[in-house]
Amino acid sequence: MSVTLNGNGHPMPADNTITGLLASLGLADKPVVVEHNKVALFPRDYDSTVLEDNDSLEIITIAAGG
């Protein structure tokens, strides 16, 4: 299975969730914003959002500044 992640093809196992994807990218404990098929998700929905072939994702990491 493959998804589009930040504009690039990204192979991944079937039946993966947003939570699983973030863990595989090393972002599980980082503050991020996830857009799934052009819809921004709440973090509470990451576990229940199962990814499908050809889904489109944008993941933006949040960095504090000052």
Predicted regions and their residues:
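Ubiquitin-like/PB1-type beta-grasp interaction modules and other compact soluble beta-rich domains
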Residues: 1-65
